[in-house]
Amino acid sequence: MSVNVNRSVSDQFYRYKMPRLIAKVEGKGNGIKTVIVNMVDVAKALNRPPTYPTKYFGCELGAQTQFDVKNDRYIVNGSHEANKLQDMLDGFIKKFVLCPECENPETDLHVNPKKQTIGNSCKACGYRGMLDTHHKLCTFILKNPPENSDIGTGKKEKEKKNRKGKDKENGSVSTSETPPPPPPNEISPPHAVEEEEDDDWGEDTTEEAQRRRMDEISDHAKGLTLSDDLERTVEERVNILFDFVKKKKEEGIIDSSDKDIVAEAERLDVKAMGPLVLTEVLFDEKIREQIKKYRRHFLRFCHNNKKAQRYLLHGLECVVAMHQAQLISKIPHILKEMYDADLLEEEVIISWSEKASKKYVSKELAKEIRVKAEPFIKWLKEAEEESSGGEEEDEDENIEVVYSKTASVPKVETVKSDNKDDDIDIDAI
C-alpha cells in the first residue's frame, strides 16, 4: 500500500507516492532489533540513499543502526513499531526531502565536505538554498554524500580531468573539446590560475581537513569491526564497554552520554552487565550523592531487568571493597537510596541477601555486607507482610460481635450467610 510522500496533503490523486514502511522485529533480549524490510523502495521514492532515513531513526531514537547494503538490510537496534517509524519518517521528509518553497519532493542534495555545507535544489520550482546542518544526521551526510552530489571541484572538472588523461594516452588533444578563448576582460591573472592548480594538485592538508579524514576512516573502521566485536568473549566486550564509559568521563561528557552508553552496550550484546561497568567508573566513597546524579544512566539498564539489577548489587559490593572503611556501615542507606530511585526491586534485593557469593569480593566481605544490610532487608520483609496482612483483613467482614449479659468480655460469633426468621433467645445465651 502506498501513501503520500507529504502526508499532510490528503489529496488521493497526489502524484508523489511512496510505499508504506514495513518493520520487522527480530531477536530477543539484549539482541532485539528492528529490520526495515522495504527501506530501499522507500528511499528510492524519496530520491535519497536508504542509509539516510535509517540513520535519522537512529539519531531520533538514540539507537545504534546497521547497514548491510549488499543484502539490502537496514537495521535499528531495539523494538520499534512500524507506525512509530512512519511518523518519524515524516520528520525526515520535512527536513531533508521537501522543498521549502513549493513543498514538492523533487529535490537534490549538493554536499560539499570541504566547506561543510549541504545545499538543496528543487527541480519543480527552481529553488536553491542551504540546509540547516545542526541536526546530527547532517554529520553523517557530510561524511557519506549521495552519489549524484557535486563534491569538491564538481563533476565537470572530474570529467575534464578524465578527458585530459585519455588525450594524453592517445598523444593528441581533440580540437572539438577545446573551449573557445574567453574575452580579454575575463582572462584571469597567471597567479590565480597557479593557485587553482595548486588546490587541485594535492589534498587539503589543514588540521581540520586531516581531522575530518580521520573521522571518516574511524567511522568506516567501526562498521568493519562491528561483527568482529561480537565474536569476542564476554569479558573482552565488557572491557570495550568499560573503556568507552571511561573515555566519556575523561572527556567530561558523561552526564549527557547515557543514551550513547546503553547503545554501545546493546551493540556489544552486554546490556545486562552495564551496571557493573557503570558502578566501577562512576561510584566512589560519595556513592549516595552519585546515585542521584547518575540515576538516569542506571535506570536505562535496570528498568524491568532483574539480571541488570543483580549486576548492580555485585557492582555495589566491588565499590564497598574499594572504600570499605567509609561505606561498610552505610550499606542499609545505600540500598535504600537505590530502592527509592527505582533501580532495585524488593524481590531482587531479598534474593541477593540470602546467598553470599565470592565471585566479585571475598566470601568474608560478602557475608559482612549482607549482615550490615539486615536492617534494610528486615524493613523490606515487614513492609511486604503488612501489605499482605491488609488483604486478609477484608476476609473478616462476616464476623459480628455479640455482647453477653453474663460474660465480662465480648464474644465473637460468626454470622451465617443464610438468614433465618427464628428470633434469638437471649436467655439461652
From Swiss-Prot:
Residues the record lists as Phosphothreonine modifications: 225
Acidic residues bias: start-end ranges: 194-207
Sites where the protein binds GTP: 27-34
Name assigned to this protein: Eukaryotic translation initiation factor 5
Nucleotide-binding in keyword set: yes
Positions where Phosphoserine occurs in the chain: 10, 227, 387-388, 408, 417
A GO biological-process term: formation of cytoplasmic translation initiation complex
Cross-link Glycyl lysine isopeptide (Lys-Gly) (interchain with G-Cter in SUMO2) per UniProt, renumbered positions: 411, 416
Subunit structure, as described in the record: Component of the 43S pre-initiation complex (43S PIC), which is composed of the 40S ribosomal subunit, EIF1, eIF1A (EIF1AX), eIF3 complex, EIF5 and eIF2-GTP-initiator tRNA complex (eIF2 ternary complex). Interacts with eIF1A (EIF1AX) during scanning. Interacts through its C-terminal domain (CTD) with EIF1 or with eIF2-beta (EIF2S2) (mutually exclusive) through a common binding site. Interacts through its C-terminal domain (CTD) with the CTD of EIF5B. Interacts with FMR1 isoform 6; this interaction occurs in a RNA-dependent manner.
Segments of skewed composition (Basic and acidic residues): 153-170
Localization, UniProt: Cytoplasm
Site (Arginine finger): 15
UniProt entry keywords in alphabetical sequence: Cytoplasm, GTP-binding, GTPase activation, Initiation factor, Isopeptide bond, Nucleotide-binding, Phosphoprotein, Protein biosynthesis, Ubl conjugation
UniProt function note: Component of the 43S pre-initiation complex (43S PIC), which binds to the mRNA cap-proximal region, scans mRNA 5'-untranslated region, and locates the initiation codon. In this complex, acts as a GTPase-activating protein, by promoting GTP hydrolysis by eIF2G (EIF2S3). During scanning, interacts with both EIF1 (via its C-terminal domain (CTD)) and EIF1A (via its NTD). This interaction with EIF1A contributes to the maintenance of EIF1 within the open 43S PIC. When start codon is recognized, EIF5, via its NTD, induces eIF2G (EIF2S3) to hydrolyze the GTP.
A GO CC term assigned to this protein in UniProt: synapse
Region (Disordered): 143-216
Domain W2: start-end pairs: 231-390
Composition skew (Pro residues), residue ranges: 178-187
UniProt record similarity statement: Belongs to the eIF-2-beta/eIF-5 family.
A Pfam entry, by short name: eIF-5_eIF-2B
MF terms in GO: eukaryotic initiation factor eIF2 binding; GDP-dissociation inhibitor activity; GTP binding; GTPase activator activity; translation initiation factor activity
